Amino acid sequence: VHDPSDLAGVRLRVQQSPINVHLAEALGAIAVPLPFPQLAEALRAREIDAQENALANVAGLALWESQRYLIATRHALSAHVVLANAEILAALGSGAAIVRDALRDALAEQRSETERLENELRDELAQRMILIELDAAARDRFVAATRLVHDRVARALGDDAIARVLAASVAARPAPSPE
């Protein structure tokens, strides 16, 4: 899979979430919403052709036993959201800045550790599977193919909401690795 057109007709296991179904369908795949615990058996039984998961999930289920290829699309960011009550934060006075600074430091450390673990997993999985890394141009084609899903979400939540989510996603994304 190097282009969205390569997914035409592929039975792709996705999380049981409407947005994941819409994303798969926008790419031309046949979305198969399936509970995660059933994934490995569905691959072995050829009930699905492919799946999309984080590297930790691929490794955790030893999916190299039932699929040969690993396409590193880097299509999703699992973000951690930190919420705070504005009144309580304001009541901290100057302590609020300490909380914000500590949170910023903790998030930076978490991102760094996540990147380190992802790189380790990618290297380990490359020993067991054929790893294909998509270049920036290919990733851009996937983004373009799923633009209608962004538009659908924007209609449901409002343009401002989707713009804020996309801006936060860009801000949280680690710097691209050299290609």
Residue ranges of model-derived segments:
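N-terminal secretory/targeting leader peptides
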Residues: 1-179
